[in-house]
Amino acid sequence: MNYRASDFGRVAVLMGGWSAEREVSLVSGRAVLDGLRARGVDAVGIDFDREVVDRLRAGGCERVFNVVHGRGGEDGQLQGLLEIAGIPYTGSGVLGSALSMDKYRTKLVWQALGLPTPAFVLLESEADLARAEALGFPLMVKAALEGSSIGVYRVDDHAGLREAWQEAAACNSHVMAERCISGSEYTASILGEQALPLIRLETPREFYDYEAKYQANDTRYHIPCGLEPAEESALQALSLRAFAALGASGWGRVDLMRDEAGQPWLIEVNTVPGMTDHSLVPMAARAVGIDFPELVWQILTQTMERQHGE
């Protein structure tokens, strides 16, 4: 269905919040705000806090474009508030957001469904360190409830494992260790029911960390990704299945690896990905002729389709 900008009413672009990803979210939010206004949408920016529902109602906002990364905005809490308030919003619902935010439970779901994801161990005590070591070094140690590679460490020995566990636990999150995959890193951007062209990521760092994502100029993004069409299609299909398995919907991103034998491995899902000038979803959209204002327009129209059951 074709919509006019006036059909959406006033749209609140929620950004900021209180997570470790606040600054990135503010940059994403400003970009989304500019993109919506470029399409004539009556959009206002709101820095997300615990009084957000009252502020939305006071401002006459009829729907929300959510760009709050991390805890509070990406983990089901904001989604639950908006559901109770009856305010349509972009992206995944409560369940899909909560599951996808938790890297450990994400992998439990994929494992139960037979989807390929690297072997992993939850680190709750000293005894678990030995179980993690049995996976074989190198390992990735991750704070399970953080995004943007915050609280993520690559370790090569017992001392590094112990230190990384303690550092990640300081993020006030449960921590897991995961077998490190050697190979190429890809990301699949999800828009509606389709996976956009894959991007292959290349960084001189040990992995695609926070600096590589948002600050570095030496990260290389390959699109086309260099795979044969059938290989790329297979990874896109796997990404769509992994996304849906978590109850995620609307838009997002699936990160995966492909090892030296060509085996794919699912890593994680982002249900509110970055929308900065370094961000991957806008980059993938441009590859199929979707500019930034059109991208945010398409994401916003999903709120109408969900609201009216289209």
PLM feature segments, named:
Residues 1-108, 112, 124-130, 302-310:
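ATP-binding N-terminal substructure of ATP-dependent carboxylate-amine bond-forming enzymes
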Residues 77-83, 207-215, 271:
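Short, flexible, mixed-charge acidic loops at enzyme active sites
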Residues 1-15, 43, 58, 99-184:
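Active-site nucleotide/adenylate-binding loops and adjacent lid/helix of ATP-dependent enzymes
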Residues 13, 190, 256-258:
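Conserved hydrophobic "DFG−1" position in protein kinase catalytic cores
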Residues 45-49, 175, 179, 249-261:
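A short glycine-rich, hydrophobically flanked beta-strand micro-motif that places a catalytic Asp/Glu
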Residues 156-237, 260-265:
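Phosphate-binding site of ATP-dependent enzymes
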